[in-house]
């Protein structure tokens, strides 16, 4: 018999989030005047808790800020849905069991909200308060919970229903009738609508015929499985369709035209189209991982090297539909699914770094709605508009989807949170806002684009899956099944608004990244075995759940399979067979394992605490059988699925698209009378051009230690990088580059041009990285369109043809991977008026290439004049691949002036791009380029401004050479008789030159090398379109000159604040507004010197060298708990310093496989132990403190005279909670939520204090940049420690070297800038920043140039690890 209890916990909302929620609730009922929230913990135990056990549980569940006294009001208890076990509960229960509480059956968490109304005069006299009526309660409740995973109950006692086991729902059959085909078809049509299957008429006929031949009725399981496996999302029916356009049969499908690129340029591609990700050729790399069989005396594997041919994975996915419905989980699971695709390639691989992109409709920011954010018809010529006309208001949106602003507040956090917790850096991406009324059709992205992509690495020997002998075990690895994401594949294939609201919401998955981390650790352990890898084949579980993944796994090997439904790992009771088999619960993989290898695989899973289950086995007969072990063997319910594989995955009817092209007459962009001052600022404020900082600092960009170029550039950390770059390993400088290109608004005017420009932009972006040749470039193409809307199908076909049959073949590059999402329109009814928003054909290109030397990557940071008043010593040159056409159609200028245009930028000649790429590579190799930035959204104006922002300087631009008559343009960069060559109106030509978004780039070169640069450009045929346009200035002004007159001048600070405005506003709606204001105001500091390192020691000195020379290598335990993700780079740094590094999981200590006594020291690594359940690092610490064996072992270790330990980030949080058993740590604080209430990923500066720490010996007084990546780094002395007595090792300092609490220089608000503390004897030190991620200079997004050349290229932080080795003697 279970025994239930409820333990109240900490505050669930910070003060500013409480105030924000109150503002929302006041819009429901203005009389609501207070809201509070407190965590509740519901505990189910197998036996009554003793007083000691209850006290232990209370201590376990004490974390965060104490709750205030209860207040009166309406109570709302939000808890997980009955019958489910939440991810939080799984981790908390596991922690409890590790804390010597075996009788705990389960711990669940809820939140009790108390909503209080005003007393009012009469109620004030009687002492009473207004109670909410039922309608208001329902409206309030809707804002307090996620109805997919949570419910609202009225009392705490009702929460005990969480532990009820619900009865399983029955299998259903669809009766097709005995002989009446029409009746059978009608029954299937009804099921199609009821279940949201999205089956076409042809598919319904196919299924009726197939089941008549099988002589039985289909089950709901089979229908749901078929619908997911054959959805547009999974089978890409439109891309494989036959086409007729304007009555003319087309000879190729869309997919055939994409494949054409690979057929013509297969070189360098290892895997294309046949797996979860594409694979391009890499190179020899030093792979670094724990080696099985090296356990020796320690019982755990030692880290080591293996030189191996290592290839690069490429994958880019979209998750548009879920993000429209529920932005945080939609984007989170989009990122998670793409990561799984990489890990499930071949026979197992390792994800490495990510990209993220968003496209939405107008944001309509509160108190900052822009003049162009309305429904004015842009097809009306500007000259015909009456200035007094009032523009129609915004088009609105359906209730069932999130607003664009909500998507951009919640979606990026969802995607970043998954990447952060899983442990993959996100290094690049894009953000576009587009919405315009064009001739009565609203074009935009109410159904957003949410794109997640990335790269990974795979051993050359693991790139292809193996065959599956009959009897091969079919295993589910990872998270449990729950009723989540039902019908997601089918739902995402429908236009938003054509499904029911409940089915739309059902189709959104929810994420648990810590679980996926555990599963990935198992995959890593498998591929690390090389030829002994037990994985024969692997697939990720995505659309359709295991009902799609398991059949794909066996179909690829020409096998059938038999599964037992009751062996599927679940954490929800009451599921029907269809819900068990078809749900899209995340963090799952399906694997094929040979029976003989299973014991070893099982041991790996148990060590990582990764759930797994053997669900079935492969069969020779190609029949798919799913049996229900709970049903009698002779009952019809015993076989929820029993069908030939070729019925499920064979050849359902091939789609035929019969479409037509639709011509449209649009006016050209009219710039007559436009005010340059206004337009310049409006363009910078447009979200597409504006700073993306709010999307970037929320993400971890350094985990793994292999990144060298992220979005942030220079000592002022401005987000303007063109390309993301990683290294292949921790030793060399070869690596990979990736970037994105997209120009979707152009498709409204000329869809094929938009496709060509997307590829062109990807090339001009990636050109910033040193790449041997353009032929090494590989592209991913993600295609979006509103198929079915008149003219859009033909536009899609023409765009794919332009890319796949023309441009890519001409460039000699291929597209080995991609995805499509072809239901990009939103329909709804607004008070009887039918409305819709139709997205343009949208090609998002991601480009990938091997990099020869990551140190040569170019950035947009301008190098300023040598000193104030001196003549400019550098020159800016624009390379204009538009050859002076200055086409404005679809540009940001057109959008902010509410125009569309009829002529767009285009790639006129593929040879231009090839010559451009070759010229930039040659100039870079010769060391002639100081800065580089491609021209894109916002045109030359935005390009130059961003370069100045990154350089923290002014710039003077002369547009004379850009306003010439194109027929008389010089082939050299100097003006010659320009006054005689000018034609047309000068002001108009200036606007076109500044704001046209033609392909090209601006380069900064030493003035002394200008002639040599032009010689190279002339060699590549580019001199005629290359022009000297100016230079940095010392005035801090951004100036535009024409005809020897200054036509525009504004302070860089003013323009940079305009450019940052959108980011600041969105961050202020999401994070602590005091912090976001502080960051915004930092732009006012004109004299800010930027990051300013100062070293008090010799960077080239290796203090560990004499001790390494003895040959002694002390053992260092690289300690991790489930969810930790920074152990690999830490192990490398320790190994480089002269230690033997061993991989020690807490499960190893619990199982007795090893003991801390076997090691000289340990490092507790960063990440998200237990997903930060029970507080960051606290769950990890409590499994030690409340477990007698572990507490004794750790206490003994700390009390040894020769031991040392380091805690970093999550390890710092954990060790701070161990302070009671660490000698000399009594004054240590806890580390709690950042003052910004946000995860902070930044490069900041710390000062090394004089302290006893052995890790900082000889570094005192140094100011050194270091990365932070945490959400809970605030040194909190309110519950523990003594700020007056604590020994501080590091403090955050500002760019002038002063200790600071100013955000974001102090990223968490810690008092007195505390970033690290140590014990009185200095042997045990903890710090929140990550030195292990920047032990090489090249790992920093910015560092002084001389650091990379010093010694072995180590950064100053390598001294920490070498100090530890020196301490060991």
From Swiss-Prot:
Record keywords: ATP-binding, Cytoplasm, Glutamine amidotransferase, Ligase, Magnesium, Metal-binding, Nucleotide-binding, Purine biosynthesis
Reaction catalysis annotation: N(2)-formyl-N(1)-(5-phospho-beta-D-ribosyl)glycinamide + L-glutamine + ATP + H2O = 2-formamido-N(1)-(5-O-phospho-beta-D-ribosyl)acetamidine + L-glutamate + ADP + phosphate + H(+)
InterPro entries: Class_I_gatase-like, FGAR-AT_N, FGAR-AT_PurM_N-like, PurL_large, PurL_linker, PurM-like_C_dom, PurM-like_C_sf, PurM-like_N_sf
Pathway: Purine metabolism; IMP biosynthesis via de novo pathway; 5-amino-1-(5-phospho-D-ribosyl)imidazole from N(2)-formyl-N(1)-(5-phospho-D-ribosyl)glycinamide: step 1/2
Keyword flag Metal-binding: yes
GO cellular component, one term: cytoplasm
UniProt-annotated binding residues for ATP: 330-341, 721, 936
Region (Disordered): 321-352, 373-400
Gene Ontology BP term (one): 'de novo' IMP biosynthetic process
Gene3D superfamilies membership: 3.40.50.880, Phosphoribosylformylglycinamidine synthase, linker domain, PurM-like C-terminal domain, PurM-like, N-terminal domain
Secretion signal span: none
Primary location: cytoplasm
All residue ranges annotated as the Glutamine amidotransferase type-1 domain in the record: 1116-1369
GO-annotated molecular function: ATP binding; metal ion binding; phosphoribosylformylglycinamidine synthase activity
Task performed by this protein: Phosphoribosylformylglycinamidine synthase involved in the purines biosynthetic pathway. Catalyzes the ATP-dependent conversion of formylglycinamide ribonucleotide (FGAR) and glutamine to yield formylglycinamidine ribonucleotide (FGAM) and glutamate.
Quaternary structure, from the entry: Monomer.
Name of the molecule in the record: Phosphoribosylformylglycinamidine synthase
């Amino acid at each position: 018999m279970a025994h239930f209890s409820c333990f109240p916990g900490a505050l669930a909302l910070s003060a500013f989030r409480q105030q924000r929620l109150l503002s929302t609730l006041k819009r429901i009922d203005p009389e609501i005047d207070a809201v509070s929230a407190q965590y509740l913990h519901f505990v189910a135990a197998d036996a009554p808790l003793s007083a000691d056990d209850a006290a232990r549980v209370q201590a376990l569940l004490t974390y965060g800020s104490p709750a205030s006294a209860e207040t009166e009001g309406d109570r709302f208890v939000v808890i997980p849905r009955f019958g489910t076990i939440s991810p939080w509960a799984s981790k908390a229960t596991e922690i409890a069991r590790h804390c010597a509480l075996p009788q705990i059956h389960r711990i669940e968490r809820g939140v009790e909200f108390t909503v209080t109304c005003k007393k009012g005069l009469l109620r004030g006299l009687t002492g009473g308060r207004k109670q909410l009526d039922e309608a208001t309660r329902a409206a309030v409740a809707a804002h307090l919970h996620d109805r997919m995973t949570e419910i609202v109950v009225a009392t705490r006692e009702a929460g005990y229903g969480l532990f009820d086991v619900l009865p399983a729902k029955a299998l259903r059959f669809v009766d097709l009738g005995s002989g009446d085909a029409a009746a059978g078809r009608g029954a299937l049509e009804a099921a199609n609508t009821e279940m949201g299957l999205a089956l076409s008429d042809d598919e319904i006929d196919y299924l009726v015929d197939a089941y008549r031949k099988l002589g039985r009725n289909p089950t709901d399981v089979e229908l749901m499985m078929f619908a997911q496996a054959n959805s547009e999302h999974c089978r890409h029916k439109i891309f494989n369709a036959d086409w007729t356009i304007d009555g003319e049969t087309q000879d190729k499908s869309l997919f055939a035209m994409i494949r054409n690129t690979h057929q013509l340029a297969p070189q360098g591609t290892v895997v294309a189209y046949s797996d979860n990700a594409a694979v391009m050729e890499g190179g020899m790399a030093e792979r670094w991982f724990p080696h099985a069989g090296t356990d020796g005396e320690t019982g755990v594997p030692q880290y080591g090297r293996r030189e191996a041919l290592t290839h690069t994975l490429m994958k880019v996915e979209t998750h548009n539909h879920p993000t429209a419905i529920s932005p945080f989980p939609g984007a989170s699971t989009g990122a998670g699914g793409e990561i799984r695709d990489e890990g499930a390639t071949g026979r197992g691989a390792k994800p490495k770094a990510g990209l993220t992109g968003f496209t939405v409709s107008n944001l309509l920011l509160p108190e900052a709605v822009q003049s162009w954010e309305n429904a004015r018809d842009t097809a009306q010529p500007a000259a015909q508009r009456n200035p007094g006309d009032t523009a129609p208001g915004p088009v609105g949106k359906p209730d069932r989807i999130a607003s664009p602003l909500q998507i951009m507040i919640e979606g990026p956090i969802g995607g970043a949170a998954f990447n952060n917790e899983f442990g993959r850096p996100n290094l690049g991406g894009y953000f576009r806002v587009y919405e315009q009324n064009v001739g009565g059709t609203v074009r935009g992205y109410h159904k957003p684009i949410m794109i997640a992509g990335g790269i990974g690495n795979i051993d050359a020997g693991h790139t292809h899956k193996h065959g599956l002998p009959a009897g091969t075990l079919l295993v589910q690895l990872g998270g449990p099944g729950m009723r989540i994401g039902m019908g997601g594949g089918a739902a995402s294939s429908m236009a938003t608004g054509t499904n029911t609201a409940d089915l739309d919401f059902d189709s959104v998955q929810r994420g648990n990244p810590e679980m996926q981390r555990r599963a990935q650790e198992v995959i890593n352990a498998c591929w690390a075995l090389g030829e002994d890898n037990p994985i024969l084949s692997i697939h990720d579980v995505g659309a359709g759940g295991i009902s799609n993944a398991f059949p794909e796994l066996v179909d690829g090997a020409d096998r059938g399979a038999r599964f037992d439904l009751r062996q599927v790992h679940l954490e929800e009771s009451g599921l029907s067979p269809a819900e068990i088999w078809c749900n899209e619960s995340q963090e799952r993989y399906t694997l094929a394992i040979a029976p003989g290898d299973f014991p070893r695989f099982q041991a790996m899973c148990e060590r990582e605490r990764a759930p797994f289950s053997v669900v079935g086995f492969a069969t020779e007969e190609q029949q798919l059988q799913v049996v229900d072990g709970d049903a009698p063997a002779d009952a019809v319910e015993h076989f929820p699925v029993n069908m030939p594989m070729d019925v499920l995955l064979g050849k359902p009817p091939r789609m035929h698209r019969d479409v037509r092209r639709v011509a449209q007459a649009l006016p050209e962009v009219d710039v007559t009378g436009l005010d340059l001052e206004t337009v310049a600022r409006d363009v910078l404020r447009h979200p597409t051009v504006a700073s993306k900082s709010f999307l970037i600092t929320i993400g971890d960009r350094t985990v793994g230690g292999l990144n060298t170029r992220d979005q942030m550039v220079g000592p002022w950390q401005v987000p303007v990088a063109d390309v993301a770059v990683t290294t292949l390993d921790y030793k060399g400088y070869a690596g990979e580059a990736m970037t994105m290109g997209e120009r979707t608004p152009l498709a409204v005017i000329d869809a094929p041009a938009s496709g060509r420009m997307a590829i062109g932009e990807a090339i001009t972006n990636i050109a910033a990285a040193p790449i041997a040749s353009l032929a090494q470039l590989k592209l991913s193409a993600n295609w979006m369109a509103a198929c079915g809307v008149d003219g859009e199908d033909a536009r899609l076909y023409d765009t794919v043809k332009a890319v796949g049959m023309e441009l890519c073949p001409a460039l000699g590059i291929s597209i080995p991977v991609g995805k499509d999402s072809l239901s990009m329109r939103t329909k709804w009814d607004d008070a009887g008026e039918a409305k819709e928003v139709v997205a343009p054909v949208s090609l998002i290109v991601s480009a990938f290439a091997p990099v020869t030397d990551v140190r040569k990557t170019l950035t947009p940071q301008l190098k300023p004049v040598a000193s104030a008043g001196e003549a400019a010593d550098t020159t800016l040159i624009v390379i204009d691949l538009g050859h002076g056409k200055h086409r404005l159609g679809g540009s940001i200028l057109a959008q902010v002036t509410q125009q569309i245009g009829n002529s767009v930028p285009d790639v006129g000649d593929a040879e231009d791009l090839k010559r451009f790429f070759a010229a930039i590579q040659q100039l870079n190799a010769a060391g002639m380029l100081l800065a580089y930035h491609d021209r894109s959204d916002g045109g030359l104006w935005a390009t130059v401004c961003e370069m100045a922002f990154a350089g923290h300087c002014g710039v003077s631009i002369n547009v004379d050479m850009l306003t010439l008559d194109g027929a008389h343009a010089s082939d050299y960069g100097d003006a010659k008789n320009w006054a005689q060559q000018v034609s047309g109106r000068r002001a108009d030509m200036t606007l076109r030159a500044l704001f046209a978004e033609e392909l090209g780039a601006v380069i900064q070169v030493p003035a002394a090398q200008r002639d040599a640069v032009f010689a190279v450009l002339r060699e590549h045929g580019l001199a005629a379109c290359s022009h000297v346009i100016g230079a940095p200035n010392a005035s801090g002004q951004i100036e535009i000159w024409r005809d020897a007159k200054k036509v525009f001048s504004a302070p860089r600070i003013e323009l940079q604040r305009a450019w940052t405005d959108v980011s600041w506003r969105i961050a202020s709606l999401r994070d602590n507004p005091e912090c976001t204001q502080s960051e915004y105001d930092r732009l006012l500091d004109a004299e800010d010197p930027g990051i300013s390192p100062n070293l008090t020691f010799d960077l080239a000195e290796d203090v560990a060298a004499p001790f390494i020379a003895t040959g002694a290598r002390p053992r260092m335990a690289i300690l991790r708990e489930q969810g930790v993700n920074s152990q690999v780079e830490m192990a490398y740094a320790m190994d480089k310093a002269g230690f033997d590094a061993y991989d020690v999981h807490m499960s190893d200590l619990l199982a007795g496989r090893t003991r801390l006594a076997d090691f000289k020291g340990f490092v507790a690594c960063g990440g998200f132990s237990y997903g930060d359940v029970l507080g960051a690092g606290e769950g990890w610490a409590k499994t030690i403190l409340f477990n007698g064996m572990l507490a004794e072992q750790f206490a003994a270790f700390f009390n040894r005279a020769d031991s040392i330990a380091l805690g970093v980030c999550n390890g710092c949080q954990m060790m701070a909670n161990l302070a009671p058993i660490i000698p000399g740590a009594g004054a240590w604080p806890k580390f709690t939520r950042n003052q910004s209430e946000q995860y902070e990923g930044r490069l900041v500066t710390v000062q090394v204090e004089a302290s006893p720490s052995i890790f900082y010996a000889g570094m005192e007084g140094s100011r050194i940049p270091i990365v932070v990546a945490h959400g809970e780094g605030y040194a909190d002395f309110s519950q523990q420690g003594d700020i007056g007595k604590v020994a501080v090792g590091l403090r955050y300092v500002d760019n002038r070297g002063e200790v600071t609490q100013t955000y974001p220089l102090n990223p968490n608000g810690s008092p007195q800038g505390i970033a690290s503390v140590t014990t009185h004897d200095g042997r045990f030190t903890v710090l929140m920043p990550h030195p292990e991620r920047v032990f090489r200079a090249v790992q920093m997004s910015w560092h002084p140039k001389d650091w990379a050349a010093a010694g072995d290229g180590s950064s100053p932080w390598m001294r920490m690890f070498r100090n530890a080795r020196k301490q060991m003697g």
